[in-house]
């Protein structure tokens, strides 16, 4: 039996070059508050020259290990990152992606085969989402006339957010 499980837990990204030299459990513990009943796992993202470090509940891991022979565990965002990374090569403009799911917004961009920016935000309304996106846009030095913003995933306030973002950014699109 085979299993691919995508874990919706906080993810710490680190350069692949630093992966073998760091104590990932200690780094993860300092980055995120842990419950104590977690096993720290990692998933290598070779195209992005990064490693995703994440946690799984030890009891859940035990059940999975007991019932499946071929197990692959990865962060929920890994397939999204991979898909949008490949898409980021289309066109000359830099791209900022915002992926919406479960009242969360995952914002990331790529540059030179690496993550340029990646962070996760809890967004309970459209105003929070717009504020975070415009702040990140400014923080990362993106150009309002040249670069692109892509909104992806389940946006409950898609029309409003797209309209307001276009008031500030020339290129803003929704990806299905």
Model region roles, listed by residue range:
Residues 1-85:
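Active-site neighborhood for divalent-cation/phosphate handling
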Residues 83-88, 92, 154-156:
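Charged, elongated alpha-helical/coil segments that serve as electrostatic interaction surfaces
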Residues 87-114:
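Gly/Thr-rich phosphate-binding beta-strand-loop-beta motif of the actin/hexokinase/Hsp70
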Residues 9-11, 104, 156:
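Gly/Ser/Thr-rich loops at beta-strand to alpha-helix junctions
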Residues 16-17, 109-111, 162-163:
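Short amphipathic alpha-helical segments
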Residues 64, 108-110, 118-120:
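A short secondary-structure junction signal
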Residues 116, 120-176:
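Accessory, usually C-terminal, subdomains that scaffold auxiliary metal cofactors
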């Amino acid at each position: 039996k085979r299993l691919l499980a995508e874990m919706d837990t906080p993810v710490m990204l680190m350069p692949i070059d630093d992966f073998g030299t760091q104590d990932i459990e200690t780094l993860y513990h300092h980055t995120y508050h842990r419950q104590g009943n977690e096993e720290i796992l990692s998933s290598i993202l070779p195209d992005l020259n990064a490693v995703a470090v994440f946690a799984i509940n030890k009891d859940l891991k035990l059940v999975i290990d007991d019932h499946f022979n071929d197990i692959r565990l990865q962060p929920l965002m890994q397939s999204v990152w991979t898909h949008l990374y490949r898409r980021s090569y289309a066109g000359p403009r830099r791209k900022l992606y915002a992926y919406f799911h479960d009242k969360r917004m995952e914002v990331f961009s790529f540059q030179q085969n690496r993550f340029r920016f990646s962070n996760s935000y809890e967004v309970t309304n459209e105003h929070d989402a717009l504020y975070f996106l415009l702040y990140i846009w400014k923080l990362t030095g993106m150009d309002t006339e040249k670069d692109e913003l892509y909104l992806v995933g389940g946006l409950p306030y898609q029309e409003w957010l797209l309209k307001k973002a276009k008031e500030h950014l020339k290129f803003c699109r929704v990806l299905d």
